[in-house]
Amino acid sequence: MNTQTGTGTSEVSKKLKAAIRAKLEELGVYVDDELPDYIMVMIANKKEKVQMKDDLNLFIGKSTAKFVDWLFDLFDRLQNASNKQGETSKKEEDKRKELEATAAAKEHEEKRRKEKEEHEKELQKEKEREKERQRERDREKRAEEEKRREEKRKEIQRSKRRRTRSRSNTYSDEEEHVRARGEKHDRHHHKDHRRGRSHERKIITSTIVRQASASPDKKLHSTVTVKRNIRPTGDQNIKGRGTMFLRAMNEASVSAGYGSSSKRSETHHEDDMSDVEALPSKPASTKSPKKSIRDRMSRISKTSEPPIEEDDAVVLEDFAQTGGGPQMILKLSGGREAIKKTRIQDRIVVDDGLRRGLLKRKIETASGASAGAATSEEPKSKHDRIIFDITPSRDSTPTDDSPTMQKWNGQIEIGDDSEESEDDEEAEIDAFVAEARGIARRESFRDEEDELPPTHQLSGGPYAYHHSTAAPTYIPTPLSVLSEQQNQMGGGAAKEDHHVKERCIFWPKCTKGDTCAFMHPTTNCKNFPNCTFGIRCLFIHPPCRFDRFCTKKHCPFTHHGTGGQQPGGAQLTSEFKNPLTSSRMLTVPSPFIAATAAAVEELPKPAARGALGSLAEKLAASIKKKPAPGAESEKKEEKSDENESKAEEPKAEVAPVQPKPLPDIAPLHSMVLCRYAGACRNPICHFKHPKECRFGANCRNPSCYFYHKPAGAAPTPVAAPIAAESAGAAKYKWTSATAN
């Protein structure tokens, strides 16, 4: 440390000595080697400022005061620098110690935190182990408890079985009496029922019988009444009227007194329901009739005999006078009109579902005192009745082991009703709603057909649409679907506009605006460029860059310069002075033009060369009359003859024109410029060409637009294509030009 201090002091002394020498030289004082050493000795002796001035005045002279002031100022700066350096080093040392203390504290804190976490983890593991041990103890307790309960349950069951065994060995006198009485009643009253049932299972025929006539009332020996629970039948198409019909039937049940929760019935036996199996059923039914009857009978309780009720009942009766077979009188609520409106005569479904629905109504069974003469009749009520006369066939023998029966092939006759009840009104409302659905559906179809726009020509060909005038069979529709359809149809009718469903030929330059009766397209065509409607499309096609000069026959783009017509439309040329220079239109009768336009519209794709036959004939006639080129006088005469013949030709050609060959006429492109212009050498080219130059072969303008006939060139015969294209050209024969 001392060595470093001494080294630093010597360096400071050297620097100070050099600074003193430089300052003296700056002041202009003569400096030798001893003067800086003398000043350094004075500094080391720490002489005061005044003493130093007195001692140096001899050597420095006038600059003594200035030099001494500079020297002491330098001492002050060095002193301040050394003090600051010491303070800085002290601060750094303090900061370093503080950082070391902070690091030690953090390390200690981290160590304590890790120890705490490890301790918490250990406690958590211990808790988990304790919980697992507790669960194990609980499982053992539950197993023991379950075992005790199982033993107790088994003991109770054993005691019950012992009591049941002891009870089953004895019968009370009352039970014996009831059983004996029931067996006697079965043998006495239901012997013929079993025979009739087995016979009915083989063959059943159904016929219509008239309404039962009124007769003195007779008591019924037994009556079975079942609580009505109306369910929809198996037909899934009757959902539309299901809710209203169900509500009406339930209200009728409550008003009749048997729709409540009370049940009234009398003593019964399984054979009392023998006639139930005589109801028609589907042979493909999967449920056994005996099983279903057993299930129904199990729900009937024994009560005292109630009075006979008139409303909505299914009565099973035996009529001895009808041939010995069982008969069923089914009373249906509602009149002829309600059933008629719902078209029940077309939609009667006889299946297991309907049979169950009928059986769940009030059932009244009548059994006579003897097997042959028991007859029960009902008084007339205000409701209609449907009577099924189920009689066995005479050619079949009754057997007890007949397991099947044939399908019900009966008919239904509806009697008139003189009065109407609330149930009838509900049925009429239901039927009216159902009828209104069919009428609304048919009317909506007719309205939709009437509103179809006359755009059948847009589809590339007229397709016939055959609408059936026959009334459709009634198929009920849910009210939600019906209302949605009616809303859609009503919305479509409200949006009907007054525009004709055809595009305006002046669009987009039409000046009428919204008052125009034709359609102005507003949206782009989605099928472009595959749209097949062409100029009849009601949507926007992009404009063609060639516009009215377009030569493509079925160009899908829009051409505003053709007045709404497709380029290459039906246009007939006029006098055939020269096919390459003709620019005038032929004047023909208006019926011919109308028929031609109609024929062209009907043809989806016009023939390529159908109308060129007549032009070829004209060309052949004109060329035939031209002689070989000679003197100018001969040319003038030939031209005059040619003009006269051509003036006569249109008159001769227009007269015999008939609409018969119209389907073969193709549109001419006389308003479309030929791409070769005056250089075209096709004598039957049907595009528009410039007029013939008046200078002819003598024209000296190399860029002349007009047509120049080749000088000295004989006309080239083109009879082969002309004859192939038109049968009328066969009468012309080509001859040499020099033969004339």
Swiss-Prot record:
It comes from the Eukaryota. Keywords: Cytoplasm, Metal-binding, Nucleus, Repeat, Zinc, Zinc-finger. Residues 186-200 have a biased composition (Basic residues). GO terms for cellular component: cytoplasm; nuclear speck; nucleus; perinuclear region of cytoplasm. InterPro entries: Nab2/ZC3H14, Nab2/ZC3H14_N_sf, Znf_CCCH. The keyword Coiled coil does not apply. A zinc finger (C3H1-type) spans 499-522, 523-543, 668-691, 674-691, 693-709. Residues 87-158, 176-185, 632-652 have a biased composition (Basic and acidic residues). The keyword Repeat applies. GO terms for molecular function: poly(A) binding; zinc ion binding. Residues 82-240, 254-314, 390-426, 444-469, 623-661 are annotated as: Disordered. It is found in: Nucleus; Cytoplasm. Residues 204-214, 393-409 have a biased composition (Polar residues). Pfam families: zf-CCCH_2. GO terms for biological process: regulation of mRNA stability. Residues 414-426 have a biased composition (Acidic residues). RNA-binding protein involved in the biogenesis of circular RNAs (circRNAs), which are produced by back-splicing circularization of pre-mRNAs. Belongs to the ZC3H14 family. This is Zinc finger CCCH domain-containing protein 14. It comes from Caenorhabditis elegans.
